[in-house]
Amino acid sequence: MNAEHSPFRHYLDLADARLGSQVVAVSDEWFAPASRMLQAGEPVWKEGVFDDSGKWMDGWETRRKRFEGHDQAVIRLGVPGVLKGVDIDTRFFTGNHPPAASLDGCFCAEGDPDDSTSWSEVLAAVGLQGDSHHYHPIDDERPWTHLRLNIYPDGGIARLRLYGVPYRDWSNQPPGTALDLAAAVNGGRALACSDQHFGRMGNLLNPGRAINMGDGWETGRRRTPGHDWVIVALGHPGSIEAAVVDTLHFKGNYPESCSIQAAFVEGGNEARIEAQSLFWRELLPAQKLEMHQEHRFERHLNALGPITHVRLNIFPDGGVSRLRLFGRPQLP
């Protein structure tokens, strides 16, 4: 199963350091710090680069174990979530990768786990190969705040991706509070798009403003009639009161204009949603865009009531760094 065809690749990487995820405990990180496993970028190889500990590696690497036991790292998720799948990535680790790994999880209402914390198995021990992705689906609806990666007995991991859905107790949401319902940290997901040649669609929903052009969604130059689009599932149904389309960092490659369609979708799969999106109602009529600028739309929005999905259309192509949809959740 490769990266592009793994079904849980469309979920949020809950271990992404950009969400605030961090390593809070580690048994050993002699050769390379465990925090590198959580970096959003792809691992790289630096030929001939060494530091005081040895060969520089883009990931977490422990020393060779000369006694019983195994190494482990505890990750506090930036946002609690339900896992849908994992990728234990050993790229560039050859001859120094662990033969096996497993995952445990826990839910801490406050703080970090301690010696009295009860851990549950999330992924039983699986075999690992060097310089490879290792994709494993997770069929477990329990939310976690912390994950513990166990490697047997030692070695290096380039990246740990923990794909899932952010967990939020919407019943405790104060009535009338407006939230960014498209935000990844609130459960928003990019489902499909016409093109993502230069920047992945999921970047639109990342926290904060984009750090550079690569941290947004950007399509290839369109050489045929039509326009580009992306479909986003909101984290929770709600009525949208303001939309923000941010073209930060996009200057000679921003869209000329954009529009937003929306619908309340019940049931169906992603293929059906994509096919029907062309006929969704208009939430935001076509609006002119400017380069490197945050555009906020309020009075231009049509009152559609509660919705679950939106389709952002950009004309004809280009890049958008962030999409924000502020609204009031539809609570029971």
Swiss-Prot record:
EC number: 3.5.3.4
Keywords: Hydrolase, Purine metabolism
GO biological process terms on file: allantoin catabolic process; purine nucleobase metabolic process
Superkingdom: Bacteria
InterPro entries: Allantoicase, Allantoicase_dom, Galactose-bd-like_sf
Gene Ontology MF terms: allantoicase activity
NCBIfam families membership: allantoicase
Protein name, as recorded: Probable allantoicase
Organism encoding this protein: Pseudomonas aeruginosa (strain ATCC 15692 / DSM 22644 / CIP 104116 / JCM 14847 / LMG 12228 / 1C / PRS 101 / PAO1)
Source lineage: Bacteria, Pseudomonadati, Pseudomonadota, Gammaproteobacteria, Pseudomonadales
